[in-house]
Amino acid sequence: MADLVHLTAAGVSVVLDCRGSSLPAIVHWGEALGDVTSEQLSDLALAAAPQPIGFSADGAVRISILPEQSAGWLGHPGLAGHRDGKSWSSAFTRTGVETSAHGVLIKARDQAAQLDLAIDLELHPSGVLRTRARLTSTAPGTYWLEHLLLFLPVPAETTELLDFTGHHLRERSPQRTAFTHGLRVRENRTGRTGYDSAYVLCAGTAGFANRQGRVWGLHTAFSGGARTVAERNYHGHSALGGGELLLPGEVGLGEGESYTTPWLYGSFGAAGLDDLSGRFHSYLRSRPSHPHRPRPVVVNTWEAVYFDHDLGRLTELAKAAASVGAERFVLDDGWFGSRRDDTSGLGDWFVSPDVWPDGLGPLISVVRDLGMEFGLWVEPEMINPDSELARAHPDWMMAAGDRLPPTARAQQVLDLGNPSAYEYVRDRLDALLTEYDIAYLKWDHNRDLVDAGHTATGRAGVHDQTHAVYRLLDELRALHPGVEIESCSSGGGRVDLEILARTDRIWASDCIDAHERVPLQRWTSLLVPLELIGSHVGAPVSHTTHRSLPLDMRAGSALFGHFGVEWDLTAASSADRERLAEWVALYKELRGLLHTGTLVHGDVADPAYSVTGVVGASDAIFALTATATSDAYPPGTVALPGLDPDRVYHVRPQPPGDAPDGNAAAWGAALPWCTPHGVRLTGRALGTSGLRLPVLYPDRVLLVRATAVSPQGGDLSERNGR
C-alpha cells in the first residue's frame, strides 16, 4: 500500500495522503503533476503541511475526506449520529487502502462506536472526481444517523463562490458571494432536487469567468433532501462538502446494516467554467447509458391543447408536426381517469374512456403512420385526493402520522415506500408500455414533499421515497429497455446526476420564453450537456411571461439543446411553419456537432450580448444573442472561443439565423463581415481580435458558422469529422 496515492487523468491530479492511522486527506486536487516519484509526492505533502499552531489540538489539524472533531476539526462534522445519546463522536482508524488505476477504496473502523466505514474515491478519465461512503453498524441495537457528508478541499486562492437559486419558471439563477471565514450551508428540504438547489457549488480565484480563472465545482448527486456546504476557517482550511439531508429517524442502522451516501462529484477548471463544465460533459457522454442515437425533434402537446384532448384535433396537430419535420410526438397531461383538469385523476393510470373511447391506439397509429415516435406524460409519484386510487387507499398518501399535508396543485404524494403502492404503480406503467407502442415517457413530479411520512408508521419517508423512485425507474428500464424517459419536475425541479443515471433528458423549465431560456440553459449546461436539455420553440406570445418574440429568436434558443416544439402548429401561419421547418432542418444538420462538440461561452464585456458556441474538430456554430439594448452604438467586438488557434476558418452567418435584425440593418447600414462570403481568419485571430457584434434589437440572435479551411482552400465538411 502506498503512503501517498497519485491519481491522474485528463490534465487533473489528485494526491491522497494515507500516512498514519487516521482517515486520509487530499493534499492536491488540481492541475496534473506529471510523472512524479514517491519522494516527490512526499515532498509535495511536506510542502503543503501547516505549522502546528492553534488551540483545538496539539499538532497540525488537517481536513480529511470525512472530517472528525476527534482529529481536532471544529468545523462542520462529516458524521453525526448516536446510539441513544452515546457514540456521538467518531474516531475512525484506517484499516486498509485498496488502489486501482483510477480509484481508491479506503476502509476504516471506529472500535468504540462499533462502526465500519468504506470510502470510494474515483478519478474518471474525464478528470471528474467522485466519492461516496458506506457506513455499517457492527453492534446490537440501533445507530441513529443524522448526517454523513464528504468534503473535498480547495486552495486558499479560492476567494469567490458561485452557486444557484431559483423558482418555478426561473430555475438555476446564479449568485456570487465572497468566500469568507465561516460556513455557507445550502439545504434542500423539498424532497426533490429543487429549483433553488446549489446545483454546482463553485469556488474560484477572484473574477473567475467562462474562460479565465481557476475554479473547483462540487455537485451532490441526489434527488431528495440534500445539504451542500462551503467552509473556510481560521486554521487556513477551505473545503466544499455535500451529502443527503436526512430527516429525524429516517436512517437507523441495526447490526450489520449499512447506509451509502450519494455520489459527490467534483470538477476542476484550470481555465474557467467552460473547462470545469467540459469535464462534466465528457463524464456524462462516456456512460454506457448515455443516449447515442440522434436526438429526435419533439413536438409536445401541452401548450398546444392543454387538457383539451380530442382525436380529431390531435390528428391535425400530428400532421402539422410531421410537416415541419418532427420525429417524436408527445401526448401530455389529461389522457387518464377523470383528468379533465389538474384537480383530479392522478393515480388512476388507466386510459380515460371519456376522451379516448377506443384507447390511445388510434392516435398512436396516426403518429406512427406519419413516421414519428409516440411519447406519453405520466406523474407516477403523485395522487389526487379526488381519484379512485385515493378513495380506495387513503393510507397510500404520504403524511405525518394521521395529519395530511396541505395539498399543492390539488395533489398529494403517493408513498412509494409502501410496497403495495409501489407495485401498483410499477404494474400500471408496465401494462401501458406493454399494450401501447410508447417510445418515450415524460415523467413529471409537480409538488414538493411536505410532511412526507409513511402513514402506517408515522416516520419520515423522503429517504425511502427517493430510493423507491430510483428503483422504479430501474425496474421499468429493465422491463422496457428501448423506452426513453425525461425527468420533469414542475419544469426543472429535478436535475441532478443521479436522476440522469436513469433518464435520457431533463426538462430545464416550464418557461420556454427564449429571453428567459438564454441564461437558464447556459447555467443548466454547466453540468448537463446540450443533448440532455429539453428546449422547445414556443408560441409567438409566451404562455408563461406573455412576452412576444420572433420565431428566429425562439428557434435559435431551442437549437442549443434537445430541440422541440410546444406550439399549436395548426394555428400557425404557413409562413411560420415553413420557417420553422428550416430551423428543424438546420437542427438535424447540426445535431451531430451540437451533441458531441465542446460547448463554449465567451466572456463578453457588454451585458446586452452573449456568445454561446459548440466547437468540433472542423466545424463550429456560434449564437450571438442580444437580450437588451447595448450602451455602445454600435457594439464592440467579441471573441469566438475554443477554435484551433493554428487553423484557418471560413466564418459567415448561418441561415436561417443569418439576419442581423436591428436598427442598423433596417436603415441599410451593413455589417461588413456579415455576408455569405464572410471572412477567413485563424482560430487565434477569432479568439483574440474576434468579430464585430451586430446591432441587434433586444431578443434577437445571429448564428455564425465557422468551418475549417483545407490547405487547398475549401471548407472541410462535417462528414470529414468534427
Residue ranges and their predicted role:
Residues G11, V604-P645:
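Carbohydrate-binding surface patches
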Residues P357-G359, R391-H393, M397-D552, H562-A571, ...:
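Active-site neighborhood of glycoside hydrolase catalytic domains
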Residues G11, A133, G256, V299, ...:
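Conserved, mostly hydrophobic/aromatic
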Residues D3-H6, V12-V14, A25-E231, V648-A666:
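Polysaccharide-binding surfaces and accessory modules of carbohydrate-active proteins
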